[in-house]
Amino acid sequence: HGAGIGVPVEDEVSGKITHINGVDSMKDKVITLKLDIRYPVTFKGDELFPKIEAHVAQAGGKAILNHNTSPCYKPADTQEIKTLLAAYDHVTGEKGVPYTIGGGTYAKHFDNAVAFGPHFRGMPNPCGEGKGEEHMPDECNSVDYMMKALKIYIISLIGLNELSL
């Protein structure tokens, strides 16, 4: 979790930094490793990259930053998040708990946005064991799941519309 690239960082909100070696290549006896780094929301990429650069240089390598996309995060105590959770709670009868993940999201490309989608505890997988999970082959949901999600989205949009953002 970051030690191998010189930045073993973590925070309480999003946990430890994660990174994967997505693509390796070699050209003219130069090995290139492309890393996808997901750093905790309380850190800044421009603060972490010099540390990565120095760590890689110690090993005789060179680090090049292709691009940096800041994490997408909105605290749970904001009116927007409270509104989304209230819609979830109303439809499901359960207490929704927000969480952060290291994954990329479309919400990074919009001001004042978060990724929001219901995950219903205990709802059976209509595709069977090992299939149909989010972002996996044969991703699927039941009509009941989709209708429940639609109700949450409608109530969420009405609630967000009533906020003065």
Describe the predicted segments one by one:
Residues H1, A57, G61, D89, ...:
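Generic secondary-structure signature for well-ordered alpha-helical cores
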Residues H1-F43:
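Midchain, well-structured core segments that form catalytic/ion-binding scaffolds
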Residues G2-V13, G60-N66, S164-L165:
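Flexible, glycine/charged-enriched surface loops at secondary-structure junctions
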Residues I20-S25, K34-V41, K62-I81, A87-D89, ...:
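A short beta-alpha structural unit
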Residues K27, E94-L163:
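Zn-dependent metallopeptidase/amidohydrolase metal-coordination segment
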Residues T32, K62-H67, E129-P137:
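A short small-residue
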Residues E47-A57:
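Short amphipathic alpha-helices in soluble, non-transmembrane regions
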